[in-house]
Amino acid sequence: MPVVTMRQMLDNGVHFGHQTRRWNPKMKRFIFTERNGIYIIDLQQSLGFIDKAYEAVKATVAHGGTILFVGTKKQAQEAIAEQATRVGMPYVNHRWLGGMLTNFQTVSKRIDRMKELEEVDFDDVAGSQYTKKELLLLRREKEKLERTLGGIRNLTKTPSLIWIVDTKKEHLAVDEAQKLGVPIVAILDTNCDPDEVAFPIPGNDDSIRSVSLLTRVVADAVAEGLMKRHNGKSNAAEEPMAEWERELLEQHEEQKSQDAAPAEQSAPAAEAPAETEQKDAPAAE
């Protein structure tokens, strides 16, 4: 059973690249054709790369690794938070702070500050040592820290792999990952540099539907890796499965039973819709 089908990718617009004037020549080998001034990505190749990325993520997690989900553009924020949370992995979906990986010691101090503020009862003015104005300022500080660092509150070490949506926008994350030798799994749109990514997935990184589909696939790989990790622990008679892992297992089994239905008919890349659907317009940053 494939982790994703050609039909799913076509239906979610994974094949739409950027306008032909906005491209990286290094992506030429991943382009199927050009239609109405838009590059069409070769989804047959994408399927193969998805399988490789899926296996890499699954194996990494099965051996105890952590996957950091990164996507701060509007089209990716919801999917990044939702899927990372579903599988208990850290994520960054609002703003990448410089040094988030390379200067983690400083970032961890900000995380400690956030946790400290979360202990404050902002509704109990009389019982606190702060004035109303001070509590208001502290609440704003807490909310700002939670937006930026809430997704990595439990990250204690360098992640084993990083899933990135839009490597051009997340160039700071890419640079830091490369400095630390952390492999990158990422969607490669036609304007990206494939040399920056260890496990590329040629596809549309501007469409909410495309980003959601591919991020879900990566999260599914994490889920499968967690199951494999737990099975290994069970054989070694180690600690029992955590509650969230048990829920994840139940969801995974339910999904497998649903997928047992006849597989959707695959369509070759050449059968991409003739009309060129416009990508979701990038939201203002």
Curated annotation (Swiss-Prot):
Is Disulfide bond found in the keyword set? Answer: no
Q: From the Swiss-Prot or TrEMBL record, what is one GO molecular function term?
A: structural constituent of ribosome
Query: Which CDD domains does the record match to this protein?
Result: RPS2
- Going by the entry's taxonomy, the superkingdom of the source organism is recorded as Bacteria
Q: Which UniProt keywords apply?
A: Ribonucleoprotein, Ribosomal protein
Q: Where is the composition biased (Low complexity)?
A: 260-275
Q: Which GO terms describe its biological process?
A: translation
A Pfam family per the record: Ribosomal_S2
- Chain residue ranges for the region called Disordered: 229-285
Q: Where is the composition biased (Basic and acidic residues)?
A: 243-257, 276-285
Q: Which residues form the signal peptide?
A: none
InterPro entries from the UniProt entry: Ribosomal_uS2, Ribosomal_uS2_bac/mit/plastid, Ribosomal_uS2_flav_dom_sf
One annotated Gene Ontology cellular component of this protein = cytosolic small ribosomal subunit
* NCBIfam families registered for this protein in UniProt: rpsB_bact
Entries under HAMAP family matching the protein: Ribosomal_uS2_B (MF_00291_B)
Annotated family: Belongs to the universal ribosomal protein uS2 family.
Q: What is this protein called?
A: Small ribosomal subunit protein uS2
Taxonomy-wise, where does this protein's organism fall, top ranks first? Bacteria, Bacillati, Actinomycetota, Actinomycetes, Micrococcales
